[in-house]
Amino acid sequence: MDVVRTPDARFQNLVGYPFAAHYVDVAATDTPHLRMHYIDEGPADGPPIVLLHGEPTWSYLYRTMIPPLAAGGYRVLAPDLIGFGRSDKPTRIADYTYLRHVEWVKSWFEELRLAEATLFVQDWGSLIGLRVAAEHGDAIARLVVANGFLPTARGRTPTAFHIWRAFARYSPVLPAGRLVAAGTVRKVPPAVRAGYDAPFPDKSYQAGARAFPQLVPISPDDPAVAANRAAWDALGRWEKPFLAIFGERDPLLGRADRPLIKHIPGAAGQPHARINANHFIQEDSGPELAERIISWQ
C-alpha cells in the first residue's frame, strides 16, 4: 500500500483554523498502521464529543463548531478520515473499502480510549459513524445525525447519485471547495474554498475522495450490505439519546431524518430540527448546531 501525506505547508494560515494538530496510528484488520490526524480542543476532562466529517471534506468543516463547543465545556475531537485532511492517504482507489473506514475509526476510538462520547456525524461520517455506534456502542453515550443516513440497498437510488459517482471516479479534477460551495445556502468565500482544497495538492492525493461514492452500497450484493443491515437492526434497539438536525435545503438528504427518527427508540421526545441549511449544514449553520448540542442535556 503506497501512502502520501499532504505537506504541512498546505495547512498554514487557513481561514478560521488555528487548531493544533494531533496524530495517532490506526489500523484495519488487513492494512498496515496509518497516521490519522485529529483536533483535540477544550478541557481534557470535559465530556468528549466526536465530530465526524464526510465527502469531500475534513475537520476544517467543523471550524465554526469547535470553539463554542469547547467553550461550553466539551472536549472536542474532530478526526480526519484516512484519505482526507492531514491524515495519511493511500494512493489507490482500491485501497479504500467501507469496512476499512469503519475499522480505522474504531481503531481511533480505541487508541484514544474514548468513553461516554457524543458522536456527531454527517454525510459519509454517518455511514461510518452509525456502523461504529451499532458495533462499538459502549464508547458512545449520545448520537447526533445531520444530513446523513445508513444505506441498506433497499429502494431506488436517485439518478443524481449515479451521475455523482461517475464524476467522482472519472473527472480529471475533483474541486473539493467548489463541491462544498455547491452544497450550501450561504456563499462560501474563496479563502474558505481554499481550505477545503488544501489536502489535495494534485490527483495523487485524491483517491480517498474519489473512492467514497463508489463505496456507498446501493446493490443488495454489495459486500457492505449485510453489516449495514445488521447495524440498522441494532439501531432499532438503540435507546440512548438520539438527535437529528437536518438542513432542509438538501435536495437529496433533506428528509432522510424521518426514517431515522421513526426507527431509533432513543429519538423519542428529542428536540429534532430542520433548519435553513443545505447538505453541508456545518458550513451554513455551524454555531447554531453547536448551540443546539450544548442546550441538549
Swiss-Prot record:
<comment type="similarity">
    <text>Belongs to the haloalkane dehalogenase family. Type 1 subfamily.</text>
</comment>
<feature type="active site" description="Proton acceptor">
    <location>
        <position position="279"/>
    </location>
</feature>
<dbReference type="Pfam" id="PF00561">
    <property type="entry name" value="Abhydrolase_1"/>
</dbReference>
<feature type="active site" description="Proton donor">
    <location>
        <position position="250"/>
    </location>
</feature>
<dbReference type="InterPro" id="IPR051340">
    <property type="entry name" value="Haloalkane_dehalogenase"/>
</dbReference>
<feature type="domain" description="AB hydrolase-1">
    <location>
        <begin position="47"/>
        <end position="148"/>
    </location>
</feature>
<protein>
    <recommendedName>
        <fullName>Haloalkane dehalogenase</fullName>
        <ecNumber>3.8.1.5</ecNumber>
    </recommendedName>
</protein>
<dbReference type="InterPro" id="IPR023489">
    <property type="entry name" value="Haloalkane_dehalogenase_1"/>
</dbReference>
<comment type="subunit">
    <text>Monomer.</text>
</comment>
<dbReference type="GO" id="GO:0004301">
    <property type="term" value="F:epoxide hydrolase activity"/>
</dbReference>
<keyword id="KW-0378">Hydrolase</keyword>
<feature type="active site" description="Nucleophile">
    <location>
        <position position="123"/>
    </location>
</feature>
<dbReference type="GO" id="GO:0018786">
    <property type="term" value="F:haloalkane dehalogenase activity"/>
</dbReference>
<dbReference type="InterPro" id="IPR000073">
    <property type="entry name" value="AB_hydrolase_1"/>
</dbReference>
<comment type="function">
    <text>Catalyzes hydrolytic cleavage of carbon-halogen bonds in halogenated aliphatic compounds, leading to the formation of the corresponding primary alcohols, halide ions and protons.</text>
</comment>
<dbReference type="InterPro" id="IPR029058">
    <property type="entry name" value="AB_hydrolase_fold"/>
</dbReference>
<dbReference type="InterPro" id="IPR000639">
    <property type="entry name" value="Epox_hydrolase-like"/>
</dbReference>
